[in-house]
Amino acid sequence: MESKVTKNTLRSSSWRVNLSGNSAALSTRLQQQISRAIVYSGIPQLILETIPLERCSDNTGVAYRSAIALKLSRAMQQSPLAIAHQLTVSLPTITQDAGKQNLIEFEVEVAPPGWINFWLTDQGLATWLQDWIQPSTDTLISFRPQQGQKNLLPYLELTTQHSALFSQDTSKIFRVQYAHARCCSLLGLAHRQGLIQIQSMDLKTSKGLIVVPYPIPWLKDDLGKGTKQPLIQLVHPAERLLIGQIMDLTDYFSGTESKHWLKLASSVSNAFEQFYRSCRIWGEVKHQTPRLAQARLGLVGVTQVVLRSLLEDQLGVLAPGEL
């Protein structure tokens, strides 16, 4: 669940975390780094899942907030602010090697009474989005590894076993399937019109990756005033909402086995429909700002990967390329 966060901070620094691995969950990566900082600080190690961390509601970007210093203050008999400073100093520093590692950058801040805020930079967000649709890897395509070959069920051919599970949710499943098919349709049209190039786009299996442009132009050409840092193109509220839903989904799936797959899938598909209604790709956008059109198509590609994995890997139903 989201919470509010403000930039009323006492300290700010730049910090990177390694995204390599088989999980797209930023929360898990951050908890791992906080756990290492705890060990480096000489504090008894905590179970990873007990490290408090939540994604925060912020209209200007992606932020996570940890109350770990507040949690440790009583046992350590120190002020939360002092502990927060100690932990941020101890956060592991990773030297970037662009050829071997996939790193995303955060701004780390300490705020009263002892919060540690992690602000994902626009460059970091671009890296995270691109990692979903990398032509060279599929480590982030599925939330969980598939166990053998599955017999996927189309929406209209649910068995008795599945109908018991989805008795009151068939319309929700169809809406998720519809959103997935819409993603495939948009990507296919963009491919035919030359906006992007898709590798092995098969509408029957709905498995395709954007190979041109590479990488997707997630960032603007010009740098932000004052910061001199590249800025993300996807700033519309509907774009932010969709990205946030996907982040929440991946964070949720990094934990224990979920019984709410359909609810999570519905949240993503609903956010996609709002994005589709609010953010144009064709017409003036395509002709006047083609890089923005390509960035939005990149977000469509990320959504397609997410919905396909939810439908086929988790719900056991077909992710159709067309309806």
Predicted regions and their residues:
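Non-catalytic interaction-recognition regions
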Residues: 2-323
